Amino acid sequence: MNGRLLEGIRFFTRETEILSALCVACGAGGRTETAADGDAADRSVFDLASATKLFTGLSIMKLKEDGLLDFSRPVSYYDPRFTALRDVPVWDLMAFAVTVRTPVRLDACPDRDSALAALFASEAMPTAGRRAYSDIPAMILKYVAEAAAGTTMAELVRKTVLEPAGMTETWAKVPEERLADCQRYDREHRIENGKYILRAGLRPGVPHDPKAAVLQGDTGDLCGHAGLFSTLPDMIRFCRAVLERKIVGEESLREMAVNRTGRPLEDGTHTQYLGLQCYVRHPVQYWSEIPVYMGREAFGIGGFTGNHVSVDPARGLFTVFLGNRVLNRLTVLLPEEGKTLTDYGLRADGSGYFRWPDGEVIPSSVKYVHQKDAHLHRAVAETLGLPEVSMEQ
C-alpha cells in the first residue's frame, strides 16, 4: 500500500470523515500504485454512479467503429418511441450539444413504466447558461445503442468493454453472493432550501442514483447514465484496457477527448468543458474534473457517490478513486437565500459536522468534489512524479 496515497486518503476517511471508505489506484507506464482506508478492500463493490457514462460512451464509440451506428442519424431512426427527437442527431446527445428535458422529473415517477413514458417523451432545446452536463442524453443513448447493436445495454457493455478488458467484477446486477461486499449508500442526508431530506432504506445492489433506482432497480437492465457496480481491481483493468486501445482505437479516444461545449462567457466565467459523454480539461482547475497532471487528450468523469476516473491515453496515465460519500453523510446543502455554508456550522469548503433535527451529528461531504485536487490528485502526482501539464501543451 502506497504511503503517500494513504496520507491523502486519510484526510477524507479520518481527518474530516468526508468519506466512510476510499480506495485509490493510479498508474503511469507499467507502474500501478494503490491504497485504501475506511470500510474498503479489494473485494469491496462500489456504485460507479455517473462513471457508468464512460462505459456507455466507449460502447457507442465501438458501435460507430464497427459501422453499426451513424451519429448523423436522428435518435428516432433507431428508436421511434422518441417521437419528439425526430430532428435530433445522435451526435447531439453524445456531445451534450442540446439540453434534453422530460415532461416530469424521472425520480418523481412512482414506477418504472411511468418513468419510461416520461423518458420517451423527452424534448430537446438549445443549451443556455454555464451548465451543459446532464444524465438524460446517456439515458436515451442506451436505447439508441440497444437498437443499433440488437442486444441489451448490459450485454453490449459486456462484449465491448468488460470482456476485452478482462473485467470479471463489474455488473449491472450484482450477483447474490457479492451483495455482502457492496458498499452501503443508506441514510443520505440533504438540505435543500430549508427542506430536510433523509433518504433511507436503499438496498445493496440498487443504484444510488434516484433515476436509475426507478428504471433499473436490481433488475440488471442497465441505464446509460448510471447503474454499474465495480471493484478497484476491475477498474484498474478498465483503465489499462483503455490506455492499451483494447476497447476502442486511437481515433475514437481522441474524438472523445475533444472539448465540445466549453467556452468563456462575458462575465469572465466559462461553460462546462465536456467531450463525448465525459469531461475534458477545464482552463480553470477549480472547475476541472480532469487533474492538472493530465493533458488535452485526457478525459474522465466523477460519480456522485464519491468516485472519479480519468485517463490520459497520450501520456499513458490513469487515476481511479472509489469512495463512499453517502453513507450517513450530509451530501447536499443548498442554503436558503442570504445564507452560506458557514451559517449551518460547516466550514466554507463544505467539510465539518451538522446536527440533524433529531440530534444526530453527521459528517458533511458537501463540495467533496472540490477537495480532490489538494488531497488526492496532489498525492497521485507526487507518487508518480508527474508535473503539472499546461493547457498550452
Where are these regions (language model features)?
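Short conserved micro-motifs at the rims of enzyme active sites and ligand-binding pockets
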Residues: 267-268, 289-291, 322-323, 330-334
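Short active-site loop at a secondary-structure junction
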Residues: 16-23, 38-93, 123-136, 223-226
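Short, gly/Ser/Thr-rich active-site loops of penicillin-recognizing serine hydrolases
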Residues: 244, 257-264, 283-285, 329-393
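Residue-level preference for non-acidic, small/hydrophobic
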Residues: 9, 24, 56, 60, ...
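A short, well-structured edge-of-sheet supersecondary motif
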Residues: 6-41, 48, 95, 104-110, ...
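Glycine-rich phosphate/pyrophosphate-binding beta-alpha loops
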Residues: 221-227, 296-310, 324-328
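Short, P/G- and charge-enriched loop/turn segments at secondary-structure junctions
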Residues: 10-13, 127, 264-265, 293-299, ...
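Short, surface-exposed loop or secondary-structure junction motifs
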Residues: 86-294
